Amino acid sequence: QQSSAASDVYKRQLLHSAIVVEKRETLKSWTILLAILAFGFSLIGTFIVRSGVLTSVHAFANDPERGMFILIILGIFMGGALTLFSFRSSAMEARGVFSMVSRETALVSNNVLLAVSAFVVFFGTIWPLVAELFFDRKLSVGPPFFNAAFTPFMILLGLILPVGSNLPWKRANILNSSKKLIFVFILSICLAGLIWAIQTGKSLIGPVGVFLGAWIVMGTMLDLFSKLGRSISLKRLIVLPRADFGKFFAHSGLGITMFAIAALTSWEKEDIRVVPVGGSWKIAAYELKLNSVENVRGPNYFSTMGVIAVSKDGQLLTVLRPEKRNYPVAQMPTTEAAIDYR
């Protein structure tokens, strides 16, 4: 997962840099380098997953010979591309000039934050291999490291994104461009304060996620509506470039994702316990009872299934049937969660 995330981050950088090249004819060398790195990290992710150098449930079809073949391809492609880039990068002269306060600068800041975060992800992924190879130590880098190292860059990115989206190209006045965002900023702060007041516990993660989500989504909406002018009509909406809609949906999706991650981290509840057959326990306003544990034979698997009755105020709501499956041919156990959406 982490190896593919690093490649995805470089692809996002490449997309933003390509926009600058298209609009302003600058950052040409940087864009070519990002294209090389994005492809290279895709190969690195393939090598990690296929070669078996890392032990993980996500590593499949392990084959050291295939891994060596991928490593050779990686060396040839990346070595050749970076060598050619080092000799020819000076020929890609940038024509566009921009000031320190402009949309170009905001996109460069976005690239820097994403580049550092991608390096952090790659470092955390590859460090157990380095530690075992050179220091003979077995290490495991888990979620605490990635959360602590990755989160600050994502918060900075979320703060910059609406401001950068509303800046004009080439040259901008930060005060004039930010005036229209003041109301959005205040409203986002108020929403975060409301969540802080009504939440159980005093975790900052949830309110910060609400603030960033509201700030990004509403700031992106403001950028879209500002292109429509004062008279918002269906006709003007239809003639807007598709790139504006693409930016709106992509940035709004990022804001919603930040909120969802923060909400899950802050407000999820996990209850691990041993329950005998016929035993019951309570979670919030719900009462759960383990009615039975059954052995089930499927078309290509054997399963141990729990039958759990869920009730509220003495009334049965639903029956959940989570399973622990084992596939004899693949020798692969899986967990099938039981989810009720009401």
Where do the PLM segments sit?
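Solvent-exposed, non-transmembrane regions of integral membrane proteins
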Residues: 4-342
